[in-house]
Amino acid sequence: MNKFLLFFMSVLVCATAKALDFTVDGVNYQLISSEEQTCKVVSGNYSGAVVIPATVNYGGRDLKVIEMADQTLCNTYDVTSVVLGSNLKKIGKNCLVNLKIETLTIPGSVTEIGDYSLSLSKLKKLVIEPSGEEDNPTAISIGIFEETVNYTKYKRPITQRLKSLESLELYRDLSCNKSGLFQELPLQSVIIGGDAAVKSEMFYECVNLHSLEFTDDATFGHFGRGIGSEAFYHCPLEGEITFPAAIQGFGDRCFSGNHFSAIHFENTTGFSIGAGAFSRSENITSLIIPEAVTMIGRNAFSSCKNLKNLRIETNGELKEAALCGNDYDVVTFTANCTQNMIAASLAGEISSGNTIVDFSPAKIKDLHVNAPVPPKQFVDFHGKTWGFTEDQYVLTTLYVPAGSLEAYKSAEVWKNFWNIKADPSAGIEDVEADAEAEEGPVKWYNLNGQLIDNPTTKGIYIKHVNNKSTKVIVP
C-alpha cells in the first residue's frame, strides 16, 4: 500500500510540474514562469511567414516571449520568413536551421545564440540590432559548430554557416570563443555601428567585400576600441574611407590588401597602427599620417605600389621597415618629427647590410626632413647605426630647412646623401586657403619645393610672403 501511494504521488508531482503548452496564431509556446509571466517558443510544423511576437496573450495575460527552445525552426524547410520579437533573449541550440529565408534581423534584446544554430544557406542579409541596454550594452554570446575537413574536426563560430551572406549590418558586440566570425563569407557590404567591436580575423579573406561603412555612433566595443588583427585581411575594400575618432588602434595586418583609394583618420587624441596594418594598399596615391599616431608598426604601409606622396606629421614611434617597399615621389617628415628610426623605416637595413624586412627598401625621389636639428638615427647594441641604403643615398634628393643645411651636411647618416638642398617649405605654419593675405610679393611652391603659378586645383601649397612661408590648403 505504501509503495502504491508513493508511486501515485510521484506521478501526480510530475504531472503538476509538466510545463504548460499552448498554441496561438499557429505558433507553439511553453510557459516558463507564471509568476514572471514569461514563455518560450517551441518546435512545430511551421511554414510560410513565421512571426514570433514580443508578447502573446494567453489566459487573459500578456506573456513575454523571451526564448526559442532548442530545435525551434529546425529543418522546417517551408518557412520563407521569420520575425523575432523584441523581448527575445535566448535562441537555443539548433534553432533557425535549414529555412528558406533570405533576410533576418536579430533584435537588441538577444544575449545568446546557441550551438549549431543559424544554418541558413540562403540567407543574404543579416541585421544585428543595437543592444536594448543603452547605458550598459551587452554582447551576444555566439555558439559554435563542428565540421570535419580532410578527416580533421574543427570548431568554428556558427556565423560561418551563412554561406550565402552578402550584406551585414552590425550594431552589437559579438562574443565567441572562436575567432573569424564571418571569415571567408561572400559578403559584399558591411556596416559597423553602435558598440560592435571589430575583432581579430572577423572578416578574414572575404574576397567579395568591397564596401565598408562606419556609422556616426560607432564606439567599437568596450575593450580595445580598435580594429583587430587581420580583421579585414585581403578584403578588396574600395573607395575613400575616413576612420572614426573612436578607433584607438589598428591591429596587425588588419587592412592588408585593401583597394581603398584614400585613407583619412579622425582621431586627434592618440592611436597606433600595427605591423602590416595597411600593407599592400595598392590604390592609394597620397597619405597623411597625423600627429595623433603614437606608433607605426613594422611594414605598416609597405608595398603600397601607387603611393607617391607621403607626409608624416607624428613624432610617434616608428618601427623598422614601416614605410618600405614603395616607390615615392615625395616623402615629408614635419618639423616635430625627430624620430631615430626615420632611416630604418624607409631602408629596413642596418649599416652592415643585413636585411630585417619583408619588403624591399623604398625608392624615394625627394625626401623632406623639416626638423631644425638633424635627427640622430638608431644605434644598435653592436654600435652600428641604422642608416639608409646606398641607392637611397645616391638617388634621393634630401631637402632640409635652409638654416640647417650645413648641419645636415655634417651630421651622421644625413651627410651621406649626395644631393642635399634647402627646402623652402620647411618650418612653415598651417593656414586655411581663405586666410587674410599679407602685403608683398607672393611666391607659390608645391610640396616638392618647385615654384608654380597661383594654385588653381585642390591640394596643399606653400605661400612665401615677406620672408615667411605658410602652408595653404586649397579645398
Question: Where are each of the predicted segments found?
Answer:
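Structural signature of tandem-repeat unit edges
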Residues: V24-G26, N45-I66, Y77-K90, L99-E112, ...
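Sec-dependent N-terminal signal peptides
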Residues: F4-V13
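A recurrent domain-boundary module in secreted/ectodomain proteins
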Residues: S410-G427
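Short, surface-exposed loop/turn motifs with a glycine/proline- and acidic-biased composition
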Residues: Y58, N446-N467
